[in-house]
Amino acid sequence: MYVEIVQDHNRQVWDERVRKGLLHTRVASDDEFKNPLKAINGRGWITGGLEGKHVLCLAGGGGLQAPLYAAAGAHVTVVDISQEMINQDNRIAQERGLKLKALVGSMDDLSMIENDSFDLVTQPVSTCYIPNLLKVYDEISRVLRVGGHYLSQHKQPINLQSAPTPYPNGYAVTQSYYDKGPLPP
């Protein structure tokens, strides 16, 4: 029961964020589509290119990541809890003539996907919205092929209260971690 309440809440919030055009709901830009591999792999974590690879964008709906992976030559499936985020993926794919499979679902239940289906599972910051991470990782392990890669982003409290400024040898935190005020917008 608790899991369903959390999922319903998350679904409603993300659907509303899309309708309002809020942060983390933007679609890929024309500039990003000029070099989609660079746009999604700016740090060089993905090696060997994406042409012909099977990629799962887990909790990665919204018209940004999945269309860029498809434009870079991957066979893409995107799973997101938000119908509105999935709608954006479908719209951008149609506008750009891209093929992708977009599914509404939770990252902790990928029963609609066969075992050993993907060479790469990519996941933006999203595990913070799930009550039971073991189910998520069990599902990722099940759908990822032997030798495949899992690329996941995570947050910690300092990420939510700081603005890193890049320098040649690292980053400077420009807002105190111990700021007693509300989190920045």
Task: List PLM regions with ranges.
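Nucleotide donor/acceptor-binding cores
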Residues: 52-54, 116
